[in-house]
Swiss-Prot record:
Binding site for ATP: 130-136
Pathway given in the UniProt record: Cell wall biogenesis; peptidoglycan biosynthesis
GO CC, one annotated term: cytoplasm
Function according to Swiss-Prot or TrEMBL: Cell wall formation. Catalyzes the addition of glutamate to the nucleotide precursor UDP-N-acetylmuramoyl-L-alanine (UMA).
Main location: cytoplasm
SUPFAM superfamilies linked: MurCD N-terminal domain, MurD-like peptide ligases, catalytic domain, MurD-like peptide ligases, peptide-binding domain
Family: Belongs to the MurCDEF family.
Tagged with keyword Ribosomal protein: no
Top-level taxon of the source organism: Bacteria
GO process terms (BP): cell division; cell wall organization; peptidoglycan biosynthetic process; regulation of cell shape
Keyword Hydrolase: no
Name listed for the protein in its UniProt record: UDP-N-acetylmuramoylalanine--D-glutamate ligase
Organism: Corynebacterium efficiens (strain DSM 44549 / YS-314 / AJ 12310 / JCM 11189 / NBRC 100395)
The organism's taxonomic lineage, starting at the top: Bacteria, Bacillati, Actinomycetota, Actinomycetes, Mycobacteriales
Catalysed conversion reaction: UDP-N-acetyl-alpha-D-muramoyl-L-alanine + D-glutamate + ATP = UDP-N-acetyl-alpha-D-muramoyl-L-alanyl-D-glutamate + ADP + phosphate + H(+)
Amino acid sequence: MESTTEVELSRLPDSLRGRILVTGAGVSGTGIAGMLHDLGLDVVVAEDNETSRHRLIELLDVDVVGTEHARASLGDYSIVVTSPGWRPDSPVLVDAASRGLEVIGDVELAWRLDRAGVFGVSRTWLAVTGTNGKTTTTAMLAAMMKQGGFNAVAVGNIGVPVSAALTSCDRVDVMVAELSSFQLHWAPTLVPDAGLVLNLAEDHIDWHGSFRDYALAKTRVLTAPVAVIGADDSYLVELTTELGLSGLIGFTLGEPGPRQLGVLNGHLVDNAFAAQLPLAPADGINPSGPAGVLDALAAAAVARSQGVSAEDIAGALATFEVSGHRGQVVAEDHGVQFIDNSKATNPHAADTALAGRESVIWIVGGQLKGADISELVATHAHRIKAALVLGADRAEIVTAVEQHAPDAMIRVTDSTDPVAAMRELVDHAFRFAEPGDCVLLAPAAASLDMYKGMGQRGDIFAEAVLSTIEGQKEK
């Protein structure tokens, strides 16, 4: 990799002037190592996976060692930069911390380099996090900033790695960053120019150890001078109050109070940076439904804090297209809608997907990651016509449906073949579906027990639906 932008090495933070250990040679780790290598720094990468090791060696002229070797030589390093997915209880990270070595992540590293002026004048950082809606909101906010004339790009989990945005030959002035709880855990000094927490619900408990630790990681973005939260999320409001956070901007589906954005007379309205200023019609926002309106309000709150006009917000929303697997109607056949919301990887996201539907044939299952699905099932029992269940935690889901939605039909596939399992459930869906029903893929669980990711899961669902419809036409 070659550096593509002017750098000021004299501004390099002292902690990065010694030997640096990077843990992980995946996408993030490779990006970290590449940026540090291009700066001429002394980098060693720890990775046990042989395929990842060989791929990195082909890309970069850096030393690659196993994690046990790295543990045995921690005294050689001045700092550890970890890939965000590495858990805090990983032995090499535990040992590093016990020796007093600082452990940070890719976002923290990029933040420190940018704020130190290594890549020129510091960028504006707009950080977006929460349990659900991050990607859509980040994309909306980037679109609003661009519409307002800012040189902005969406970075982080949504697409461009933060390291790539910093080193790009086309300078970026505004980084609209979708940040995960993992990245924020490893970002102890990050203070973005604006921080947004959309909502909080149980997720990644297996990684963080508790819901509270997960939530506290998310709230790190609220150290920003402009801090925005979902005012309809009672737990988030209670937590920020407990933490003594003040001066927050809120967004709500209701009429906005002081320092809030909300909905009034069918319009998104700003009552935080103006007096009940209409921004855009609530009708026609993509994605449709309450979740889309909330995402638009959240993005608008941050955009308004940066000086984007109501006209530019309306213009951005008018042309905004949602990313895949977030509520797309795959097909409509004989009065039945087939909807792909594979991105609903936890109960909170599935709750949003189920809300407002009248009669749902629900395809659900995967890895619950420690989350409890009982409340979700009980809340929507009246609309669940059938539950079609797959995945590693299928037994737990079946128990919840039997207890809390006893009138729902249940079908379970024990197949671990990703295509066969989905086709089996789609076949059941076609047999059960009647005009007015919605066949909804909203798994409420992660996909990696059977699929390469939520995208593949959604694609296979769509393929199964469309091929079944086509097959029926040929009969």
